[in-house]
Amino acid sequence: MDDSFKKIIKMTEGPDRTAAIAHWLQRLYPEESIPVLVGGSAVELYTGGAYTTGDLDFVGHISPAARKILTETGFTRHGRNWIHEGTKIFLEFPSGSLGEDERKAVLTVGRLRIQIVSPEDLLVDRLAAWKHWESPVDGVNSFLLYRAQSKSFDEDHLEKRTMTEDVQDALYAVRSLYREYTHDLPADKVLEKWSLKVR
């Protein structure tokens, strides 16, 4: 097993470990084909661990070189998932590329640089799941992500994407709750009850 991966699996679960796993995987690729981190693990990194998940989702393809190293490191393929049984690290590759209007970004966590979906596009994805799939956890994720990244959003891109995905009303609800709780986080029960109010 790769020495750097041995160090990673000894880390405490949380955003630092998630970033280390993402960085380890992305180093297996040449710059032009690095898979982009998306989904709940991207929310985890952008929120500094306010939300945590057990799996890492990437947009991209598994190269033959990456497949070989994953297998040698102890990962087993199950469809589009790669699972490391000893540590329960789950890697998923749900699609080959970001959507046409989606952007990638680079997020630095400690000394690690991670290729990740932009915070605006991640927020829109979570808002859409909350509104269209009636997923309360994505409502909570939307609020946590907005709270953590509100000062760094590209507002023009965010507005364009919310219109395209028909989630302006969901964004309005998140902004309203944010204004109410600018200086502190609402209690878990308050946030859960709020997230059940599907747009």
Predicted regions and their residues:
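Compositionally biased terminal segments of proteins
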Residues: 1-199
